[in-house]
Amino acid sequence: MTLDTLIDSGKRFLLFGGKGGVGKTSCAAAASVWAASRGYDVLAISTDPAHSLGVIFEQKIGSEVKAIKGVKNLSGLEIDPKVAYRQLQGELSKKSTEDLSSFGIESISDLDMGSPPGADEALAFAKVLEYIEKPDHDLIIFDTAPTGHTLRLLSLPDVLNSWLGKMIKLRYTMGRIWGGLKSLVGRDTDERDESGKALEKLKATVEKARVELSNKDRTSFVPVMIPEAMAVEQTEMLLTALYEFEIPVSNMIVNMILPQEVSCKFCESRKAMQDRHLKEIRRLYSDQFRLTELPLLDSEVRGIDQIIHLTKFLFEK
């Protein structure tokens, strides 16, 4: 069963995820190229700190949206959590720092409550939110980080919401104190706390993202796995989290399957192991999801030609 119906289903967000090394970036890249070839305006976003997306497309992508060479209608973006973290910190603290400097406090961080759990991932998620809000692209395809990072990413709407609520309360409490101090030194007390407004805007965006990511008409998460014990285990963990966060799943990819006929003892042993796990995967998931089974290719997926070759298995066979 192929993924073609998923691409043409009218969804705006597709997320590919799974254990490290199972080929999720290759699948995300192939889905992006296939969708773009059908006339959709596509943005492929990597939230994986390793950023393999640029490696597969054989071009530098980076932290600004960039057209993918050789593919019409396709752009790429690699979100660097540390850069996103610094940018948002700067936006939230700039106005408060200006106010505090008059009283001998150099930075809002001197008075801050600290960062949310998984701060760098949280702020990378905040960067993702910008693109969830923008109507610039027909389809956004996410190449997510390995399972553990992705589970934290999926929990961030709740984490950020709680943290932002506390931060907003603190900012406005301190705003009243700053207002009193300003009046003592003759400064304008009517000026709004810009960092507080920025926090409120971010909180509203997080709420919107929660709604978008749980909307089955708009979003689908595609777990990618290989027929090995660890990958099966981590996929089950991922699915449990996806259900908990109400993120829709309709398709699943089983990658790197050996051919039926193998000709060496090592290959026979690996094939027997894969067959056991493949049987279990089909038993567990074939009634719940559309399973797409991909063969182990004879070369790595790098460059447009190899990506197009992979699309034939994902979408045509």
Regions found by a protein language model. Give the residues of each.
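C-terminal lobe/tail of nucleotide-utilizing enzymes
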Residues: 1-8, 207-317
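Nucleotide-state-sensitive switch-loop elements of NTP-binding domains
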Residues: 1-14, 22, 27, 31-200, ...
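P-loop (Walker A) phosphate-binding loop of NTP-binding proteins
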Residues: 19
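Phenylalanine-focused residue identity feature
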Residues: 13-16, 57, 103, 125, ...
